[in-house]
Amino acid sequence: KTWPAESVRAAAAAGQRRFGENYVQEGVGKATELSGLGLEWHFIGPLQSNKTRAVAETFAWVHSVDRLKIAERLAEQRPEALPPLQVCVQVNVSNEASKHGVPLDAAGALMMQIARLPRLRLRGLMAIPAPNPDYEAQRRALRPVRELFERLRADGLAIDTLSMGMSHDLEAAIAEGATLVRVGTAIFGERSKAGA
């Protein structure tokens, strides 16, 4: 996010194929501008109902589904000509009302509902814990997500993706079973602050 299409183009030239975006308009613009490069676009930011069509038409993955209404809109708006939209349910690991995501104890029921929707393929869970510089604290924050993921798989839910870990906590996330990490700062550098 906030990096120009030229930065994405340079990373693609170095072999990177998957790119994540937090902001719908910015992501759609980059995906359109770089459409000839065969890149896979992942939407990882909060998603509002009025933005679902643009996401359904542009992105290959959505990591931040936390309400059935959003999943239903994505399913309705995913073009038939495109492969099913790959979806992760975002869980709120900090139990803070200000954070996005469904509570851990409600994720399983939501996932069962999403798994039945057409044009979507439920892939797993996504989490963004509160930043913490301590490795063991990072692992403790992510462990309940891994445990939920394992329980859901044991219960027969066909999921394979645990999307957690960013530049500051990817080692802890991998140790806790992450199958997909979202690394931006370590590749592109610190984002410039608005107005700076």
Describe the role of every protein-language-model region.
Residues 2-168, 174-176, 188-190:
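Conserved alpha/beta-domain cores
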Residues 178-196:
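Gly/Pro- and small hydrophobic-enriched strand-loop and loop-to-helix capping segments
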